UniProtKB/Swiss-Prot annotation:
This is Peptide chain release factor 1. It is found in: Cytoplasm. Its main location: cytoplasm. One of its GO terms (cellular component) is cytoplasm. It comes from the Bacteria. Belongs to the prokaryotic/mitochondrial release factor family. It comes from Prochlorococcus marinus (strain MIT 9211). The modification N5-methylglutamine is found at Q239. Peptide chain release factor 1 directs the termination of translation in response to the peptide chain termination codons UAG and UAA. Keywords: Cytoplasm, Methylation, Protein biosynthesis. Methylated by PrmC. Methylation increases the termination efficiency of RF1. SUPFAM superfamilies: Release factor. Gene3D superfamilies: 3.30.160.20, 3.30.70.1660, 6.10.140.1950. PANTHER family: LD18447P (PTHR43804), PEPTIDE CHAIN RELEASE FACTOR APG3, CHLOROPLASTIC (PTHR43804:SF8).
Amino acid sequence: MDTSTLKIRLETARSSFQNLELQLADPDVASDPKRLETIARERARLEPLVLDYEKLLEIEEELLEVKDVLRESKSDKDLEELAQDEMRKLELFKTNLINQLTLALLPKDPRDERSVMLEIRAGAGGDEACIWAGDLARMYERYGQKIGWSVRPISSTDADLGGFRELIISVKGDSVFSQLKFEAGVHRVQRVPATESQGRVHTSTATVAVMPEADPVEVQLDPGDLEISTARSGGAGGQNVNKVETAVDLLHKPTGIRVFCTQERSQLQNRERAMEILRAKLLEMEIAEANAKERSARLAQVGTGDRSEKIRTYNYKDNRTTDHRLGINFPLENVLEGELDNLIGACIAEEQRLMIEELGEQSEN
C-alpha cells in the first residue's frame, strides 16, 4: 500500500472518529444505552489508529523542520551532523509507524476474537494414525496451557491401541481463532510406530478442523431437521456406569452431520454440548464455502482453512517439522511440546504480507 493510499484511509478513519465523538456528546445518544455502547466501542477501536496517525503527522512536520536546519547549516559541520542524526532517527520512526499503521488497516476476520472447537480425526495409517491424532491433541493442549486458555475434550471416540479415532476439544480464551485457524488441514507424520516390529518408517495422517464457536442467533437450527436419540454412557462411577442414558446422538438430516456426546454428566448437558458442536460444524461449512468463493489465489497460499489441505509434515528421523505453506522447517521436539508461537507467528506474518501486496495492487488499479 503506497503512502498516499494509506493517508486517504487514515483520514477517513480520523473523520469517522471525530464524528463518533460528536455523537457521544449528543443527549439523544446518551439516553439510549445500546446505541451508546455501540458508538463507544467503535470509538475505542479507532482511537489507537487515530493517535498513531497524528503521531505520523507530527513526525512529518519535525522532518520538514530538520530539513530546513540542514539547508541552513552548511557552514556549521557540528550542527549539520546533529541534524542528519536527528533526521535518520525520525525517518526510522516514520517507517516503523507506517508499517504499524498499514497492519492496523488490514481487513480483520470478524471471528478472530472467538473461542474454537478443534476436531482432530485419524486419517490414513490405521492404529498409528489414531495414536498420531492423540499426539496432536496433546500438542494443542500444551500450547493452550502455555497461553492460559481453557482446553478440555468434549467428545471423543477412543482407539483400541491408544489415541483417538476422533476427538473434539473446546479451546476457550482471548483471540483463539486468530491463532489456531492456521492449524486447519492435514498433518502428516513420518516415524517408526511403536507397533512396528521391523523398524520401518510409516507415514500416517490426521486432519484438524478449526471451528469458531457459533451462537444460536448466528446459526439457527430447525427442530424438524434434527434427529436426537440417547444411549447409555459411563456415569460418575460405581453403580451408575452404563445404567443411565446420558449420551446423546444428534443427527442433522439436511447435511448428514452426526454428533455423539458422552463427556458431560447429564443428558441435558450432553444435548447442549452436541448442539454447540453442530452449530460450529455448520458455521465451518459456511466459512469454507465463502473462502472457496472469495479468498484470492494469493491468500490461499497461506491456507484456505479447508481440512483436506496438506499443511505440515512431522519427520521424526530428521527432528524436523515442515510447514508446506511457508516452506520453513521448525524443530520437531519443540513443536510437539506445544511451542507453536514461532510457527503460528510466521503464518500470521505471511498472511499480512500477502494482504499488503494485494491491497497495493488494488490501489494501483
